[in-house]
Amino acid sequence: MRNLSDCRLYGILDLGYVGIDDAERVTKSMIDGDVDLIQLRAKEHSVKEIVDLAGKLHQVTSAAGVPLIVNDHAEIAAKVPVEGVHLGQDDDSLAHARKKAGRHVLVGKSTHSLEQAVEAEREGADYVGFGPIFATPTKPDYQPIGLTGIKRVHNEITVPTFCIGGIKIDNLGQVIAAGARRVAIVSGLLKAPNIAKYARACKALLNPET
C-alpha cells in the first residue's frame, strides 16, 4: 500500500459526476493513470449504497496498492477495510471519527484557510485538503483562496497538504509554481476523455524528476 507521504495526485471519485454503475471503471482508469490515492465522495447516496460500493472498489484499489478514502461517513470504515476517511469542516471531530471507525485509519480534513489547516494538524489530521484554490462547482459557497496562500500553508504545517478546488491540467503548473507539492483533482479528471492519460500528464508535472 502506498505511503501517504509518497502520494502526490489524489483522485476524487465524485458520484455527482460519475454514475454509480460506472464507478469501478473510472476507478480502474485512475489506477491505470497512476493516481496515488482515491476518495469516494457520494454526497447524495445512502450509507448502505456507499458501503456496498466501497467494498467493491476496495477490492480493486487494494490489489493495486492504492489507498481508498471514504468521504464523510467514518462508520463505513468499521464495515469496509478502507484505508481512511475524509472529513469536512462541519463533520465529526477527528477523535469521534476515529472512534466510529473502530480501528486505525487515515483521517484527512478539508480546510479553507491557513487557520483551519493549522487547527486540523493540531487536532491530529493525517493530511489536509487546502482550498478551493480556484472557483469550483463542487464548493460553490466558498470563496477561492487563490495561489498566494499555498506557500504559507506549507511553511506552517508539516502534514501532507493537498491543494484542491478548480485544479486542472491547464492551471496545475501555476499551482505547483506557487508551492504546491500535492493536489486533489475532481472534475478535471472525471470529465477527461481519457482519465488515465490525463492523470499521467498531471503526475508528470508533479514528479518532473521521474
Kindly label every feature range from the protein language model:
Residues V85, V183-A184:
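Paired acidic/hydrophobic, glycine-rich loop segments that form the ligand-binding mouth/hinge
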Residues G149:
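Conserved cofactor-binding/catalytic machinery of classical short-chain dehydrogenase/reductase
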Residues M1-D92, K99-D126, Y142, R152, ...:
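Conserved N-terminal beta1-alpha1 strand-loop-helix module at the mouth
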Residues F130, F162-I167, I185-S187:
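Glycine-rich beta-strand-to-loop/alpha-helix junction loops that act as flexible
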Residues A178, R182:
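C-terminal binding/interaction regions
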Residues P137-D141:
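Short, glycine/charged-rich beta-strand-loop motifs at protein surfaces that mediate ligand recognition
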